[in-house]
């Protein structure tokens, strides 16, 4: 259930921007309507934050599997998983609706040129002509609560996981426990490192093109890599990859 929702969120996250960009490249038309831009803002926030929430839920799932293996099926039952996924969807949908609705109050002086490959809310706020203080406050609190909250949960879960793995006496047991969460840890590291890269790029450079290129990583590359990273645990896929690389030309 968790994996299906994460894969669905990743597909929708990339679909929020790639189809429009492909059409623009084909038609050589870089214009997007106001309604289309607000729609991109809504879905971009929705599935981006949903990714964050689902990664936190999956971190808790790994924590229960490693730290409380005998109670795993009792704790992580289908009802709890369903409630966690539903809560993630409802919270992110309400947040996305609030922020995109707040974007409707922004006014722009002339035809707007966004130095980005997708309509991101922070770019719209920077280019607005009217008072953006309410938008800034909403974005700030959303980043702290909906971004920092799941991250804190992930860090806490992995601190407990590391402590449990260190307490295992056999090296084989440690390897088996680590392999249980290796894929999730790789996805989390990739997700937050690309977000950090975008933040640092926008903070220390004034070049909008470099910021746009950096944002491609977390909005396109990372969601496309996530299913592949998780599928590496599939023995059939690993066997096929080994046969492919061993095949002589």
From Swiss-Prot:
Tissues in which the protein is found: Tongue specific.
One Pfam family named in its UniProt record: 7tm_4
Any GO MF annotation of the entry: olfactory receptor activity
Domain of life: Eukaryota
Keywords attached to this entry: Cell membrane, Disulfide bond, G-protein coupled receptor, Glycoprotein, Membrane, Olfaction, Receptor, Sensory transduction, Transducer, Transmembrane, Transmembrane helix
One GO BP: signal transduction
InterPro entries reported in the protein's UniProt record: GPCR_Rhodpsn (IPR000276), GPCR_Rhodpsn_7TM (IPR017452), Olfact_rcpt (IPR000725)
Record-annotated membrane-spanning stretches: 1-9, 41-60, 83-103, 137-158, 181-200, 211-232
Keyword Iron: no
Cytoplasmic side: 61-82, 159-180, 233-249
Residue positions the entry lists as glycosylated: 130
Topology relative to the membrane: Multi-pass membrane protein
Main function: Possible taste receptor.
Family: Belongs to the G-protein coupled receptor 1 family.
Protein name, per record: Olfactory receptor 1571
Organism: Rattus norvegicus
């Amino acid at each position: 259930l968790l994996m299906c929702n994460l894969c669905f969120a990743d597909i929708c996250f990339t679909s929020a921007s790639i189809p429009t960009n492909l059409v623009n490249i084909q038609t050589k038309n870089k214009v997007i309507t106001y309604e289309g831009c607000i729609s991109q803002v809504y879905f971009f926030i929705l599935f981006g934050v949903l990714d964050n929430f689902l990664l936190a839920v999956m971190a808790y799932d790994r924590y229960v599997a490693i730290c409380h293996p005998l109670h795993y099926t009792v704790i992580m039952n289908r009802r709890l998983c369903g409630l966690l996924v539903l809560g993630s969807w409802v919270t992110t949908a309400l947040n996305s609706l609030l922020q995109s609705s707040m974007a409707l109050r922004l006014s722009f002086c002339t035809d707007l040129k966004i130095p980005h490959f997708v309509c991101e809310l922070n770019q719209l706020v920077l280019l607005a002509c009217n008072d953006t203080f309410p938008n800034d406050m909403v974005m700030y609190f959303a980043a702290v609560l909906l971004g920092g909250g799941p991250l804190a949960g992930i860090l806490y879960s992995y601190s407990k996981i590391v402590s449990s793995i260190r307490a295992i006496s056999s090296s084989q047991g440690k390897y088996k426990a680590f392999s249980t969460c290796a894929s999730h840890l790789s996805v989390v590291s990739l997700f937050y490192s690309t977000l950090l890269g975008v933040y640092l790029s926008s903070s220390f450079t004034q070049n909008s093109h470099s910021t746009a290129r950096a944002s491609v990583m977390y909005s396109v590359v990372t969601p496309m890599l996530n299913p592949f990273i998780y599928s590496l645990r599939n023995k059939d896929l690993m066997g096929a990859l080994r046969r492919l690389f061993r095949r002589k030309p």
